[in-house]
A protein has these predicted regions:
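Positively charged n-region of N-terminal signal peptides that target proteins for export
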Residues: 1-6
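Intrinsically disordered, low-complexity Ser/Thr- and Pro-rich stretches
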Residues: 7-9, 80
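Bacterial N-terminal signal peptides
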Residues: 9-19
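Beta-rich carbohydrate-recognition and catalytic domains
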Residues: 24-148, 153-250, 254-317, 328-333, ...
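Catalytic cores of secreted/periplasmic lytic hydrolases that degrade extracellular macromolecules
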Residues: 325
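Active-site pocket scaffolds in enzymes
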Residues: 381, 394-395
Length: 438
């Protein structure tokens, strides 16, 4: 039988239409909507759940950390909590409390650590896989630090992580404009509860990155800041909705291993800091670089592009909120867990009451991307989402568990006080995450 080009073309178009209709008739849902509650607030109106952190031990044990805030937390009751799971996250055992916040768990040598801040940096150590813990040890004196449970990086026989110091204390609003992300390095076999076993990079405060940032930042053409954000108090785009002076916070550390990458260092002595960009807009992260010197010291500066121009902001889906970066060696890809913005252009004075603060501050859709270079991102899927903007799924941490990603989320349900002040810490599992690569 002979088929004309016209007949063949019509048959192909009909087939494509049927395939398309079939594809769109299927509901595309989140990758890991089902969850296990690791911690639930006993009083959602006065006790809030923050800073989920997760690590996997070589034994397969999962370690989770979180902290609590709000007027309902009794004085003297440790804000932080450690949990472990030996059944893949289906059930959790409370192991210890600790008197600091903004912490994350990590392994170094044969020990497990949790490092955070109670203004000063503090750390605890376990030598039995999280069952028992040392007394808290201070790493600084009379300083003011900040962070979230961002990533850790291993290289050169050391562990690297970032904490952020508030260096001036003169912003009378949210102080991210005066924060300096500080890369910290510790030897894997050393006792990391001792200050002398850590090396701190030099400090670069955000207020020292953009000329005239305090009055009229010398930066234009892509809307930074989005709302007026003058020092020292910022502005109110609408009642009870604050636009603090622009800044960076909640910083991850990455290292480029691809020799073709523009910022690859064959000596392995250059690290890059990827931070949440508080600008009032969406879709950008703020970055800096840290270079290790032969004497072991580390210097923090801005990165440059081939034109010689400095680069401070890069494309990053969800970069306006806390995000988590994980490098996966088998795929040689960076994985990004972040908050998806869907409605950042609604006027601040017309936002629904259950929307938290500024229009770019959506917190109820947790998304996953992958990238070969930390700039060009491919969407892998929604991880989980709340039923309403108040029911958050955000500030999540992740770790690799075999072929899966395990995720710990700062979450809320209908009882939560707000999208920011949630009442749950939830565990999620993205199965066979490497199959999402295309």
């Amino acid at each position: 039988m002979k088929l004309s080009i016209k007949t063949l073309s019509g048959a192909i178009m009909t087939s494509m239409t049927l395939v398309t209709q079939s594809a769109f008739s299927q509901t595309i849902g989140p990758l890991a909507q089902e969850h296990v509650v690791v911690y639930e607030s006993p009083d959602p109106a006065s006790i809030y759940c923050y800073t989920p952190g997760i690590a996997r031990l070589n034994s397969g044990r999962l370690v989770a950390t979180m902290d609590r805030g709000g007027r309902g937390v009794k004085k003297g009751d440790p804000a932080g909590k450690v949990f472990t799971s030996d059944d893949g996250g289906r059930s959790w055992t409370h192991r210890a409390g600790f008197p600091f916040v903004h912490a994350r768990p990590f392994v170094a040598g044969r020990s497990l650590y949790v490092l955070g801040q109670a203004r000063d940096l503090m750390v605890i150590r376990s030598d039995d896989n999280g069952v028992t813990w040392s007394a808290p040890a201070k790493l600084t004196e009379d300083q003011s630090w900040h962070q979230s449970a961002c990533n850790v990086h291993y290289a050169n026989g050391c562990v690297y992580l970032v904490m952020e110091r508030r260096v001036t204390g003169d912003i009378k609003s949210w102080g991210v404009g005066e924060m300096a992300p500080v890369l910290m390095r510790g030897k894997l076999g050393a006792d990391l509860t001792r200050r002398e076993n850590w090396t701190f990079a030099s400090e670069l405060s955000f207020r020292n990155t953009i000329p005239n940032v305090e009055k009229d930042p010398a930066i234009d053409f892509f809307g930074v800041p989005f709302f007026p954000a003058p020092y020292p108090r910022g502005s109110l785009p609408a009642p009870r909705r604050n636009s603090a002076p622009i800044g960076w916070l909640e910083t991850n550390v990455v290292q480029f291993k691809d020799p073709d990458h523009m910022w690859f260092d064959p000596k392995g002595k250059t690290f890059h800091l990827w931070a949440r960009a508080h600008t009032g807009g969406t879709g950008y992260a703020a970055i800096a670089k840290v270079v290790e010197h032969d004497d072991g010291s580390m210097t923090t500066t801005l990165e440059t592009v081939p034109s010689g121009k400095k680069i401070l902001f890069v494309p990053c889906p969800g970069g306006q909120m806390r995000f988590h970066v994980l490098y996966d060696e088998p795929t040689r890809l960076f994985w990004l867990l972040s908050s998806q913005a869907t409605d950042s252009m609604t006027r601040a004075d017309r936002l629904d009451a259950d929307r938290f603060n500024l229009p770019n501050n959506e917190r109820h859709r947790l998304q996953l991307h992958f990238s070969k270079n930390m700039v060009d991102w491919c969407f892998a899927g929604l991880v989980a989402m709340g039923a309403t903007p108040k029911e958050s799924r955000h500030y999540a941490s992740m770790a690799v568990d075999g072929g899966d990603l395990v995720v710990l989320s700062r979450s809320g349900d209908a009882r939560a006080k707000s999208a920011h002040d949630g009442n749950l810490i939830t565990f999620h599992r993205v199965k066979n995450f490497r199959s999402l690569v295309y």
